[in-house]
Amino acid sequence: MSLSIVISQLFNGISLGSILLLIALGLAITFGQMNIINMAHGEFIMIGAYTTYLLQQLFIQYLPQAAFGYYFILAIPLAFIVAAFIGLLMEKSIVRFLYKRPLDSLLATWGVSLILQQAARTIFGAPNVAVVAPEWLNGGLMLLGVTFPYKRLFILALVLLSIFLLFVYLYKTPSGRRMKAVTLNREMASCLGVSTRKVDSRAFALGSGFAGIAGCSLTLIGSIGPTLGTAYIVDAFMIVILGGVGKLKGTIIAALMLGIVSTFVEMSTSATIAKLIVFAFIVIFLQWKPTGLVGTKVRALD
């Protein structure tokens, strides 16, 4: 195996891992803090993708062609806002009443998932639609005999920026520190005056917003449709569990591991077999370390 092939596969693995990470970040926030298995998380990816598509159509119809290159920059925060707003509505109207009822919340969010998919089919149609990338994202960077597409490099930069902003929010802002406190010990945070209800709403909106950004980035690598999110939601759950529920650092490590391992295994097998091998590895690993890569440390009384 030549060096260029190794570098190319490594880049593809990191690229895949970064996309999965962007999806799993939002899931880690909601699943880790609220213990809610949000089966509609994939549909927030779809919402972010269709928000990007709608903004593209508005630029094509109502703005001069010279402005088209800027639509994607505007689509990123817009996808976050739209997905976060819908997530906030979902939390306040449905999820809030299902805390500590895991089976009911699983069924309810699955129902919301089906409703959102059908709404997308009604509005946009069942066939997939394409989003045209701006001109400045076409082409690639040639280095060491390997072409690094600008689209993939942009997604990597977007993921790094998202991680940086998330950690700044969680560790440097009062709102983020309250969210961390609720994640670590909900009862103690409540006793100290933290409004866990407000924190839960904010966390669900934040997680949904990150899914929206993931949907926006996915428009750069393929067409989009009503079932876009279902192709990624299983991998996202595996990443969150492998990394350690509620552990963002573990989620980052697990996403990169899953992306790189899957890419190299696919070289000698198929995508389906590679996914089975990775899934078997995760099951075996969790038998050895049930808390994941970055588990919660606890003390026991003798």
Short names for language-model regions:
Residues 43-50, 96-121, 229-241, 270-289:
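Pore- or pathway-lining transmembrane helices of multi-pass membrane proteins that form conduits
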Residues 97-98, 102-172, 199-202, 264, ...:
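Transmembrane helix-bundle core of multi-pass membrane transporters
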